[in-house]
Amino acid sequence: MSERENLDLQNFYFRGLHPRVFLGTASDRYAGWLGQIYSEERYTDRITRRKKTVGKMSFVEEVLPVDSVEEYFQHFRVLELDFTFYRLLLEEDGRPTANYHVLQKYGQYLKKNDSVILKVPQEVCAQKMWRGGKFVENNSYLNQDIFTRQFYDPAITILGPFLTGLIFEQEYQRKKDRSSSKDLAAELDLFFGEIPQDNRYHLELRTEPYLDAPVFKVMEKHGIGQVLSHWTWLPSLGKQFAKSGRRFLNSGGQSIIRLMTPRGARYEEAYAQAHPFNRLVPSMLHPSMVEETAELMWEAIDNNIRINIVVNNRAGGNAPLVGQQIGLRFLEMGQKI
């Protein structure tokens, strides 16, 4: 085992949990993790402060520089970068966007055995997008050319072997707006049949009725992994997995669990409770989430699956402390097996 692959949960070193376990977080660079993941003295006078409006409330976010990812990967084996969800990497005419340059900067600090998961831009995944104060139809929805040319190709060029997963997240569909699961399955079948074949694709559907046989059949056909998401309007992780017959569908032998928010809690509510992300919020952290995550980790291992656990601050206030709880429960279960 290399020096980086050590295990010390008290000090948030998770890389040595298990060869098939990749525990990490959704986004990084949070100043709230100083003293846990990041060394305080290293970032003196290097913290950027920016305002963020969430719902009707305004918050100040404190963000570390990109080179902090070197320290991040001393603790975690995988990082999900969410900023790619909000903008493509290339403009239509091929010019690099700001996101391209940020991702390129991340790539400069990655080392052997570091692993990055990217969220595919909403311009490709979302049926509707927020424009001019309202949701409007997304004309680029499941556009294979935009996905390939303006995101996939440059992402691979920038990250190379460090890119180990791509998440297609589709927003929750209200009943009056949603199509049938058969129609969605047909759309997905066409899309995944046209884009480059790749065993790193994973699909997160936030509408429970879409966790249905026609959709899972298409996912299995194309080797698309089912993202199990602990999120506002979705059933428990175990129930989501049961809907697919407890099958690991990704052709690359991977699975992704995303711990986003407490079930039943809206984004705005969870963000306000968790901010500034420097402590555990017991009222947010559901014991069942920790329990089910640990159970699924062992189930994946028993099936020779690489399991990626992505923890968001909004799942319990502070992602490293939530990860600590998961790691402890995982090890406890291992002693009983």
Residue positions per predicted region:
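Residues lining hydrophobic/aromatic ligand-binding pockets adjacent to catalytic sites
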Residues: M1-I337
